[in-house]
Amino acid sequence: MAVPKRKMSRSNTRARRSQWKATAPHLVKTVENGQVTYSLPHQAKVVTDSAGTALFLEYKGRKVADV
C-alpha cells in the first residue's frame, strides 16, 4: 500500500481537491397540463391524469412502464 513520505501542505491539498468539480445537470423545460416542469432529458417522465394520479412512465414519447 502506498503511503506518502511527507505531510501534504494545506495549499497543495486544496489545490488538488479543487479539481473535483460537480457539473450542473442539463434540465429540459416541458409543459404538461399547463404546468411547467424541469426534468433530466434522459429519464422517463411520469404521465398523470387531470386529477394528478400517476398513470405510466413515458420516455421519448413511448410508454415504457406502468406505475
From Swiss-Prot:
SUPFAM superfamilies: Zn-binding ribosomal proteins (SSF57829). InterPro entries: Ribosomal_bL32, Ribosomal_zn-bd. It comes from the Bacteria. Residues 1-21 are annotated as: Disordered. Residues 1-19 have a biased composition (Basic residues). The keyword Ribosomal protein applies. NCBIfam families: rpmF_bact. Belongs to the bacterial ribosomal protein bL32 family. GO terms for molecular function: structural constituent of ribosome. The keyword Glycosyltransferase does not apply. This is Large ribosomal subunit protein bL32. It holds the Pfam family Ribosomal_L32p. Keywords: Ribonucleoprotein, Ribosomal protein. One of its GO terms (biological process) is translation. GO terms for cellular component: large ribosomal subunit. Transmembrane segments: none annotated.
